[in-house]
């Protein structure tokens, strides 16, 4: 029996920040139904694919009814009758239908939701876990990064660096590493309370104490790691996402950072001091504005041999921009966000390109999340190696980690079979 896409239907739902987003249901001819929910970001790169919003007064202009209409109308009409097992054909059909360079006509939220829903339906139709359907064999669990102190656009406090993350370095399994993170997270709460600060949470489940500096946040992290019974860097390491575009002033070309107004060279000197003071930092993301490639390149030239330097806002999971980053030696790692580019196929192209050029990759959630666990399966399927999905708190974050625990258990039980399992999905 030939299985084909019977229809796709969308509706407007809400994400973890109370903003509207798109949910898509895919219906196959064999009776299979699957859904996907699309996340959205607070700190977004200018080169990201367009997230179609309605504008106007309703829901602060953030409604997505036009994106929903696009799924239910032209996207549905274009995909009816296609094989759900040929992901590349599904995605390229939508890209061609949209006809713009940034998916501005149909909306990346409409296109991605459909891309994900059909992939999940195809896996379900074959009675396979999504990670196995997408990845086939030789699957590995990822290193996870957890945003436990939120600043920047993710919190209302005095810290300009957006994310302070911890990652388990010494671990016997994903579960073992995650338990270390949970222990450190609870120790951090105690450290913050002992210092007299509130322990309210930011968008990504991390604490958002009203600290005065990034150094203060890093000292708290170090103290929490030790309090939890671990050794900084040896057991638990630290990473940060500066999201520097959020504190870069385009009018004067300076970085307005925690009471200072610095040029690129002064910002570089600050990072140099910070990394020397905190050797437990192993990964740095977006240390400069997305258009400040010159200083980004200088940062990588200076620290790239000892630290992971992750590019996000300046490449936006876009293969064309990643090629330029490779040529210019901008970074040594690429952040992967499916909704920045808008289809599974293009995201896979970016991962392959980075890996071919000896770059690491890190799959990422967004600050406006849903309970959808697609990225957990996707990270394992692609052997991306790294995932960041927020703190071990707030259900929309923890759902991803719980899914990884399930996957680890399944891989452990079925490892011998998985090593010989064919890849059933066509991405070419």
Swiss-Prot record:
The subcellular location is:
Cytoplasm; Secreted; Cell surface
Reaction equations catalysed: (2R)-2-phosphoglycerate = phosphoenolpyruvate + H2O
SUPFAM superfamilies linked to this entry: Enolase C-terminal domain-like, Enolase N-terminal domain-like
Query: Native species of this protein?
Result: Lactobacillus johnsonii (strain CNCM I-12250 / La1 / NCC 533)
Answer yes or no on keyword Cytoplasm: yes
| Binding, (2R)-2-phosphoglycerate | 162, 337, 366-367, 388
Residue positions binding Mg(2+)? 241, 285, 312
What is the cofactor note? Binds a second Mg(2+) ion via substrate during catalysis.
- Give the Enzyme Commission number: 4.2.1.11
Which top-level group of life is the source organism from? Bacteria
Q: Which cofactor does it need?
A: Mg(2+)
Family under the similarity heading: Belongs to the enolase family.
Q: Which UniProt keywords apply?
A: Cytoplasm, Glycolysis, Lyase, Magnesium, Metal-binding, Secreted
Q: What is this protein called in UniProt?
A: Enolase 2
| Transmembrane region(s) | none
| Catalytic residues, chain numbering | 204, 337
| Pathway field | Carbohydrate degradation; glycolysis; pyruvate from D-glyceraldehyde 3-phosphate: step 4/5
């Amino acid at each position: 029996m030939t299985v084909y896409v019977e229809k796709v239907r969308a509706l407007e739902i809400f994400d973890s920040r109370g903003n509207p987003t798109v949910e898509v249901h895919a219906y196959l001819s064999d009776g299979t139904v699957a859904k996907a929910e699309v996340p959205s970001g607070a700190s977004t790169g200018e080169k990201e694919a367009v997230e179609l919003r309605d504008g106007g007064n309703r829901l602060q202009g953030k409604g997505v009814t036009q994106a929903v209409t696009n799924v239910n109308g032209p996207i549905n009409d274009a995909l009816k009758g296609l094989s759900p097992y040929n992901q590349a054909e599904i995605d390229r059909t939508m890209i061609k239908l949209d006809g713009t360079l940034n998916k501005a006509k149909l909306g990346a939220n409409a296109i991605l939701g459909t891309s994900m829903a059909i992939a999940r339906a195809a896996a379900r139709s074959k009675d396979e876990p999504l990670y196995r359907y997408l990845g086939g064999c030789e699957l590995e669990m990822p290193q996870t990064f957890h945003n436990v102190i939120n600043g920047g656009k993710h919190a209302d406090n005095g810290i300009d660096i957006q994310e302070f993350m911890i990652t388990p370095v010494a671990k016997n399994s994903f579960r073992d590493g995650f338990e270390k993170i949970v222990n450190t997270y609870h120790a951090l709460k105690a450290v913050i309370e002992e210092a007299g600060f509130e322990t309210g949470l930011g968008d990504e489940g991390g604490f958002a104490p009203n600290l005065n500096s990034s150094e203060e946040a890093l000292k708290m992290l170090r103290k929490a790691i030790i309090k939890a019974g671990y050794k900084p860097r040896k057991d638990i390491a630290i990473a940060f996402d500066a999201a520097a575009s959020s504190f870069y002033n385009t009018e004067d070309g300076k970085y307005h950072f925690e009471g200072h107004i610095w040029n690129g060279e002064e910002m570089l000197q600050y990072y140099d001091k910070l990394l020397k003071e905190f050797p437990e930092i192993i990964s740095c993301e977006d240390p400069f504005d997305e258009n400040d490639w010159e200083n980004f390149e200088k940062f990588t030239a200076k620290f790239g041999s000892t630290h992971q330097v992750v590019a996000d806002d300046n490449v936006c999971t876009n293969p064309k921009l990643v090629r330029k980053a490779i040529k210019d030696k901008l970074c040594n790692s690429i952040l992967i966000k499916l909704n920045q580019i808008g289809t599974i196929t293009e995201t896979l192209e970016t991962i392959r390109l980075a890996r071919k050029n000896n770059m690491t990759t890190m799959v990422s959630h967004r600050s406006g999340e849903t309970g959808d666990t697609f990225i957990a399966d996707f990270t394992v399927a692609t052997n991306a190696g790294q995932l960041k999905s927020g703190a071990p708190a707030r259900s929309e974050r923890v759902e991803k980690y719980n899914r990884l625990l399930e996957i680890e258990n399944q891989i452990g039980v079925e490892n011998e079979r998985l090593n010989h399992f064919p890849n059933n999905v066509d991405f070419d």
